[in-house]
């Protein structure tokens, strides 16, 4: 095989290395088996890319989450048919030895100290970039296979997680994941969580007005807000990665001179004909 050309992830994502043998580095964020290969999701420079790799001999892929790796493979760039817009870039690794583990995650992240939820967006000199953090809180809401919301004494946090196991509001859980920002708001990505053997606790709600929400000050908090129901529809949804489909109720409400939407489990009632506080 030809010598792999070291490239930045930005070069790869620009599509200019299509069909070339290249070398990139990054952090393993997730994986999923597919046929005779394992698809690793690699994060680098704010991008995430799929890398198709023959199963590493004698290594449990789960232990590679958080590891820094160096990868050599062929870049495959996918474009839309007529407009030739770049859709995605995948790296195909022909040999297991082209998937080089440079540094494993330093220990069990669940053994690290628990950090307050409001500190995820703050500077922490002891935190190594690209490594997972350990949090703990009370469950306020969950969409299994999609996300989970936690609350502690400092505030709330959204955790993105593909786990389908269900937890209930009030359950106390601990989680580890990669801190990041989405739409300029802090979030814990690729989170793994587990229940803590503690008695369920009642989450604290905050009474707010619509202007606070419009200012972005209550992201991931459990809140109470009042509004007049103007419309109600039910929509089908399917869990990410499969699973049994279900229904959700979408309410359109009015508060003062503004409209906003509320999403929740299907109620089976004609909520569109009544005005209720929520």
Predicted features, each with a name:
Residues 1-278:
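OB-fold single-stranded nucleic acid-binding module
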């Amino acid at each position: 095989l030809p010598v792999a050309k070291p490239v930045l992830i930005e070069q790869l994502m620009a599509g200019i290395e299509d069909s070339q043998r290249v070398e990139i580095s990054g952090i393993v964020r997730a994986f999923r088996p597919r046929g005779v290969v394992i698809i690793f999701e690699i994060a680098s420079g704010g991008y995430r890319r799929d890398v198709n790799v023959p199963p590493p001999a004698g290594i449990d892929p789960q232990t590679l989450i958080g590891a820094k790796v160096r990868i050599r493979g062929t870049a495959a760039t996918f474009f839309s048919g007529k407009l030739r817009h770049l859709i995605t870039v995948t790296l195909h690794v022909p040999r297991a030895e082209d998937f080089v583990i440079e540094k494993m995650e330093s220990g069990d992240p669940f053994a690290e100290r628990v950090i307050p939820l409001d500190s995820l967006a703050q500077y922490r000199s002891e935190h190594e970039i690209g490594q997972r953090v350990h949090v703990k809180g009370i469950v306020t809401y969950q969409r299994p296979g999609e996300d989970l919301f936690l609350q502690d004494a400092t505030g709330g946090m959204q955790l993105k997680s593909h786990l389908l196991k269900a937890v209930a509001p009030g359950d106390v859980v601990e989680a580890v994941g990669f801190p990041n920002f989405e739409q300029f708001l802090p979030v814990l990505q690729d989170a793994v969580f587990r229940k803590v053997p503690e008695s369920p606790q009642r989450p604290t709600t905050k009474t707010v007005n619509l202007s606070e929400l419009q200012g972005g000050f209550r992201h991931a908090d459990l809140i109470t807000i009042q509004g007049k129901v103007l419309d109600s529809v039910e929509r089908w949804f399917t869990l990410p990665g499969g699973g049994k489909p279900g229904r959700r109720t979408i309410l359109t409400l009015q508060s003062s001179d503004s409209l906003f939407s509320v999403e929740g489990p299907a109620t089976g009632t004609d909520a569109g004909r009544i005005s209720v506080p929520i």
